Regions:
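Structural motif
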Residues: 136, 250-254, 295
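N-terminal secretory targeting modules
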Residues: 1-191, 196-197, 201-203, 374-377
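Surface-exposed amphipathic alpha-helices with a cationic face
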Residues: 281-291, 320
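Catalytic His-Asp segment of secreted/periplasmic serine-dependent ester chemistry enzymes
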Residues: 301-377
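Conserved SGNH/GDSL esterase-like catalytic core that processes O-acyl groups on lipids
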Residues: 185-190, 195-281, 303-306, 310-313, ...
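A short helix->loop->beta-strand "cap" motif at the edges of active sites that frequently abuts
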Residues: 290-294, 328
């Protein structure tokens, strides 16, 4: 399924949080996305009822936590209209129904149950999204523990029974992938944390480096697997999150900042450089064993303590050797995000790079991998 239906949206919509209400609640979610490739295609949505990575200290949501019993009541796709600079902040302006929406079914049924940890693929639905138009999505879910993310950066509205409301980062459950039967050269995933996901970039602006890179090479099917607070230790467990990464041809791994800040659940402390390198090595080996080409990123600068900066420097000095040992390419966008000298660890565009930082990081990707004959990935 993952070879036929590939990502066609560059924003991250994985799960690092959970709507844990201890009672069944209903959520109607509507979102607008800019598709990577426009046109008339067959689409399927893909969802996994579990939490991919650990959020903050892990008291509410932690990697591989099971979701609850979810009932999916309805789902739709539609042409969301012209991309016209709308701010998508006033839910009262949203129509009750999406004009021209196509109903999504699941094994020919309009609703379905999603068990804890279950994977769900919808049936296909054919829809035309003209160039310069949004892909609009809506679904209604009921459950007492629904995995989600607060940091998707999409134009999202949530109706909890009092009409659509929006915010900068509403807790909104969304499909893990908007799969599209479209032509592509390769499937390219970005496995990372909030910096990859694009936290602190403008909502609905597609300013993060992953979205900017996707715009540079629309013939590639880009899947943003970045999640706020995510650790390499989360991915190294080789569960629901890394399974997504294994469905790609190339994966750019940019993990480690939160390991140095927070550490893994098991350790209960900040990870040391050697521990982090061991977890990154597990990720490399697992991905390569699945036939995936791995590109390693140096860790970007962050607001670390002086002790953590020492570990950060040690990791960045070790990654090139790790890449040599395992035959990985290197993506060094760390230097372009530095305000000071090399390895000074002074963020130039904010600890979470803003839109300018996203542009600089994407430009570095182009310099590293674009040649006169094409992309070398």
């Amino acid at each position: 399924m993952f070879t036929k239906y590939v990502s066609n949206v560059a924003l991250g919509s994985g799960t690092n949080y959970i709507l844990d209400s201890r009672e069944t609640r209903r959520y109607r979610v509507r979102a607008y996305f800019r598709p990577i490739m426009s046109g008339e295609f067959n689409w399927r949505i893909y969802y996994v009822n579990s939490v991919n990575s650990t959020f903050a200290g892990g008291t509410t949501a932690w990697r591989n936590r099971s979701g609850g019993k979810i009932r999916l009541l309805s789902a739709y796709l539609a042409d969301g209209g012209e991309i016209d600079g709308r701010e998508f902040i006033d839910g009262s302006l949203e129509p009750e129904t999406l004009e021209g929406a196509r109903r999504i079914t699941f094994d020919s049924a309009e609703s379905c149950e999603i068990a804890p940890d279950a994977e769900l693929w919808s049936d296909d639905v054919r829809i035309n999204i003209p160039d310069g138009h949004y892909l609009a999505f809506e679904w209604t879910l009921e459950g007492d523990a629904i995995p989600c993310t607060p940091d998707h950066r999409a134009a999202v509205f949530v109706d909890r029974g009092e009409g659509f409301a929006a915010g900068d980062s509403p807790n909104a459950p969304l499909p893990a992938m908007f799969g599209c039967e479209r032509p592509y050269v390769k499937r390219l995933a970005f496995l990372g944390d909030s910096i990859t996901q694009g936290c602190q970039t403008g909502r609905n602006r597609y300013e993060m480096w992953t979205a900017r890179i996707s715009a540079m090479l629309p013939e590639y099917a880009v899947w943003n697997l970045g999640l706020g607070y995510a650790r390499a230790a989360d991915a190294a467990t080789d569960a629901c999150w890394l399974k997504k990464a294994k469905q790609n041809d190339v994966v750019v791994v940019t993990l480690g900042v939160n390991d140095l800040l927070h550490g893994s659940l098991e350790r209960g402390r900040s990870s040391m450089a050697g521990e982090l390198i061991a977890d990154i090595t597990k990720i490399i080996v697992t991905l390569q064993s699945a036939g995936v080409e791995v590109i390693l990123s140096l860790l970007p600068p962050f607001d670390f303590s002086e002790e953590q900066k020492l570990e950060w420097r040690a990791v960045n000095l070790a990654i090139p050797e790790l890449a040599r040992l395992y035959g990985c390419k290197i993506y060094n966008f760390m230097s372009s995000l530095e305000a000071g000298g090399i390895l000074e660890c002074k963020p130039k565009y904010g600890a979470h790079p803003n839109g300018d930082g996203g542009r600089v990081a994407a430009d570095e990707f182009r310099r590293a991998f674009k040649t006169e004959s094409g992309w070398r990935i």
